[in-house]
Amino acid sequence: MGRIAYREADVDLMARMMRAEAEGEGKQGMLYVGNVIVNRVVADCGDFIDLRTVDDVIFHVQGGNYSFEAVQKGNMFYQRARETERKLARQTLESWRSHPAKYALWYFNPYAPCPPTWYDQLFRSIYGSLFL
């Protein structure tokens, strides 16, 4: 059994999100995004209470916005998943975890504007994204 229960539709959905959020960071960056998605399903705390599925996490709304910008903006998220990303998604759902995203629940682009509430938090930078 994987880290969480999932269906083939979850593999596809997660693969699309991993590509939309991190294609520019390569396979490793996409795996990190997948790690964050699975961690949110597992977390059951704070902002992620009652999120039990990949679908719940990806379409979660916080403060009036989707948690993942790609859902709101569309970009590559609404394109079909490619087999490369599907394999990465399956790998993450089954067992893959790595530092700095091993327990991460968020990530963001350090070069983009961010809300003031994000300042003074501990983070780790790798592959162009920051992990909290």
Put a short name on every predicted segment:
Residues 2-132:
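Bacterial extracytoplasmic/cell-wall-associated proteins, especially those involved in peptidoglycan
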